[in-house]
Structure formats: structure tokens, C-alpha cells
Amino acid sequence: MEKAKQVTWRLLAAGVCLLTVSSVARADSLDEQRSRYAQIKQAWDNRQMDVVEQMMPGLKDYPLYPYLEYRQITDDLMNQPAVTVTNFVRANPTLPPARTLQSRFVNELARREDWRGLLAFSPEKPGTTEAQCNYYYAKWNTGQSEEAWQGAKELWLTGKSQPNACDKLFSVWRASGKQDPLAYLERIRLAMKAGNTGLVTVLAGQMPADYQTIASAIISLANNPNTVLTFARTTGATDFTRQMAAVAFASVARQDAENARLMIPSLAQAQQLNEDQIQELRDIVAWRLMGNDVTDEQAKWRDDAIMRSQSTSLIERRVRMALGTGDRRGLNTWLARLPMEAKEKDEWRYWQADLLLERGREAEAKEILHQLMQQRGFYPMVAAQRIGEEYELKIDKAPQNVDSALTQGPEMARVRELMYWNLDNTARSEWANLVKSKSKTEQAQLARYAFNNQWWDLSVQATIAGKLWDHLEERFPLAYNDLFKRYTSGKEIPQSYAMAIARQESAWNPKVKSPVGASGLMQIMPGTATHTVKMFSIPGYSSPGQLLDPETNINIGTSYLQYVYQQFGNNRIFSSAAYNAGPGRVRTWLGNSAGRIDAVAFVESIPFSETRGYVKNVLAYDAYYRYFMGDKPTLMSATEWGRRY
């Protein structure tokens, strides 16, 4: 379909210059509208603006016409009158780019220095930070100083570097004498906490002359956190200096936990810390003493610190450490240390039942496990497998017939056309706005409508937006079923497993790109793609852009998954963790556990929360997909369940 559309696009473009006036008449059919839309887009890309202007009036009834209008306005935003932009935004209140256009035009009016026009166009605070800075600067320019200073303060108090457009607002605020030096200290604290050393240095250098002593100390501390003890001893003890010292101390602990541990008494004395503040420092160091390389003395100190801690996440980390080393006594100790609310989590209820089974208290344990089985997800399935019972999936059925009123309207019409043109990311923006505006019942119908139209990613997105967790068919559609069947055929990886990986990685959005460069359905990095193509002699791949094509992505992704699956003896726990965190880390974790623990303990003891959640999800998703493919939804194979880790 994709290639056919590209060929059609080229053929249509070839005839653009041959258009006659009669051919510009309004298109009657959707196919004709699509044809004209393609011609206009091609003409626009070729800068044939006379053709664009000639053809656009004939497409006013086409659902994607507002996108053409948007491009027309933004291509010449520097010369647009405010009334044109205002009318467009008002006429298209649900169009995603119209929502960003307001902020863009605020910035344009600021460039023109039309301050009154800016406030007339945007009487309310705009959305983006840059536009807000221009908005409050306009307030100052029109004599509304108090509102300007209030806005400046709100925009100032962040640890991030703000856009250049904010500089002039901050400058007039400072010149007015309304900027309290304490505002500098507060922003320095936020920047220090965010690790923005450059901003800390700039801000400290701008402080008034009578603050130069503390400013110099701040700059030294930001550039070299190891001077924290000197900072603590040479500055007066205030809430600000304590907070700065704590941030620097955390940096020291990341580099040298033992040095930080030994520093705590001196730091506490110099900054007059109370017990809660001292415990915060202990917690910071305790997090860094969870490895296998700690001494007995460090381990005792760590456990003493955690025993006094109020940090639930730190205590949970200690529970997982006990699980990872097969320390049953420690497991019991640290589970008991958890607060009641945390004990109600699925994972800790399961491990409490596990301890009860070990003590022969089978009835109590099974009661907990049966209660868990009433829920959905990883641990409810684990509970069923633990007591040898079948896990019953709870599936809510969405209405097969969708209310026609939901499928009408400009938003749905735009979604249909965007999906036709394979503009998935833009369609997702439209869809998100549409789904968010509906009731839960309507969201279920929209999920079903997307499912019926094979808009797999939109089906999933609707279930997430509506928290429709038991609508499993719409949450886990058999997307790209034929492609997965073809590219897992002859491989050892089950089709359901490959689909579970893709569902976890992309939620079935074929055009998604991660911030680090992973692309497409199975979120493949360009380097991984190149290596896999070479290793498996996959023909036809030449550039990372091809990873956005579903077939190419599935071909390469299933090949790489097969590679890691075979590396780890066809064990999905290992290969899933390796797909997410890398094979090297999985081997390290296996070396640490050294065959002392079972499968569930290994999963729960994975130190990276993202990877731990990833493995749990993939195993559960695999079970769902096996169910929809006609198999039993067992979480783990007998081999995976029975081996030691």
C-alpha cells in the first residue's frame, strides 16, 4: 500500500503543470479529493505556489484542508495579520497544530514589538515558555508592571535554562529592583538539584555585590562537589546552605560512597543538621551500597541506615536485594519493614505468600494467591502458576456496533484521512484530543472503532486514555499478524512473543521514534539494524528511515530477537531483559544470582525498574497474545519456571 501510494503520488505530480482552469472545480468524490490533495502537496514542495493557490479553493470540503490552511499561514507568518490567525484558531479549535499556532504568533508579534497587538491577540497567558515570557514582557511594556513581575517570578523559579526570549523580561524585572536576591538563591538551588552547573555559575555571577562571598562558594561547590565539606564549614548554616550541601553530597556519593559515608558526621556538625536531615544523607549513601562489592562493615552500616529510613523505595530496593541473593531471612525482615500501604502491592503480597508456604501455612498462602488471581498482570498470573491453577482472563467486551454520532465530525474525518496517508503520529495527536473529550463508554466504542479499522495503535491509545484495562482485545490487537507469522516462521521465537515485544516497545505505532534514535514497531537502533542485517544477510536495507516501514522493522526486529533468544538458551526472561537493557547486563545479573533463586525472584530482583517492568509486561503480553491465538495463557514455560537463576 505504501509503495503504491508513492507511485500514485509521483504520477499525480507529473500532471500538476498541465492543469486547466476546468480541472480546479471542487472534487465530488473522496478519491478525487485525495488526488487533488496529493497534487497540492507536491506542488507546494516544488514551490509552485501559483498551482497551490489555483487548486486550494476546490478542496475546502476535504477533511485535511485545515492542514493546508495551516501551512499557508505558517509559511508566511511574518506577514500575517492577527485577524487571519485568530479566525483560523477559532475555526479549528480541535486541530492540534492550531493549538500551537497561538504561541507561535505571540512570538511573532513580539518580534514585531507590537505589544498591544500581542495582548489583544492573546488576552490569556499562552502555552509555551517562550510565548509566556513575551506575554509578560508585553504586560510590562503596556504599564501592567505588577502582573509582569508576578509572571517573571513564576518563569524564573526553575532549574532549567529558559529561552533567550525570557532574558529581556528578567532584565527589566532586575532593573526595577523587584527581584529579591532570595529569588537568585532559590533558582540556584533548583539548578543545582537539576545538575545544571552552567546555570548555577551564571546565576551566582549575577548576584549583588554584597552576596559575592556566598556566590564564590556556590561556584566552587558547583564546579567541584568534593569541596562540600569546605563549603559546609565556611558558610553559615541556613536552609539554603544545607540544601546545597545535600545536593553536592549526593554527587560525591555517586562517585565514592565510602568517602561520602565517612563525611556524614562532619557535615552534620558543620551545618547543624537534625536527625531527619542526617537520615537523608544516610539514605543517599545506602542506595550506593547495594552491590556485591561492599565490605561486611559497609553492609552492616547500610542495613542499620535502611532500618531507620522512612523511604519506601529504599526499603523495597533492600527487599529486592534479599530476593536476588536468595536471602530468605532478609526477605522476611525487610518485607516486615515495609509500610502497610506498600505491603498491599501485588509483588509484596506474592512474596508474603511465598514465605507462608515455606513455613507450612498453606491455607493462608493460598488465600493470598487466590486473591491475587482476581487481578490482571504479571503477579496474578504467577500466583496461578504457583498453585497449579489455570489463570482466567477477564475480558470486557466493547460494543461491536459503534454509535454513528461518534464516527462523524471533523476530528474523526481527519483521523481517517491521516491514517490513509500513513501519517500515524499526526493521527495520534488528533485521536488523543478526540478520545480525551469523551466519556468512558464512548472511549470504549472509539477503541473498538479503531480496532475494526485496523488502526492498531489508536485502538491501544484509546484503552490507555480511558483506563480500559480489561478491554484486552482492543489493548492487544493481533496487529500485523501476517507479517509476524511470516518472519517468525523458521525461527525459534514464538510469534506471540515477538508481538508482545513489539506491543511493549511501540504500542503498535509504526512511526514512533525514541529520543535516543530507536525506530518503529520493535524500536530498533540504527546500529543494531546494521549489525543484524549483516549477521542474517537481510536484503534491501540501506538507511535507518526504512525502520519506519512495518515489514522492514518486523523482519530485522524478529531476527535480532531470535539472536538474543538463542544467546540465552531460548529463555524469554533473559532475552526480554537483554532486548531492553543489553545482553551484558543480563549476564552480570545472572552472575550475581549464581543459580540461587527461582524465576520470579530473578525478575523481581532486576535492579533497573524500567527493565523489571519491561520483562513483567512482555511475559504477560505474550500470554494475552497466545490466548487470542488459541493457546493457553500460561505465563512461563515449564523450563523457564523450573530452572534456577
Swiss-Prot record:
Q: Where in the cell is it found?
A: Periplasm
Q: What SUPFAM superfamilies does the record tag this protein with?
A: Bacterial muramidases, Lysozyme-like
Catalytic EC class: lyase
UniProt region (Slt-type domain), positions on chain: 492-582
**Any GO BP:** peptidoglycan catabolic process
Pfam families named among the record's database cross-references: SLT, SLT_L
Q: Give the function comment from the record.
A: Murein-degrading enzyme. Catalyzes the cleavage of the glycosidic bonds between N-acetylmuramic acid and N-acetylglucosamine residues in peptidoglycan. May play a role in recycling of muropeptides during cell elongation and/or cell division.
Q: What is this protein called?
A: Soluble lytic murein transglycosylase
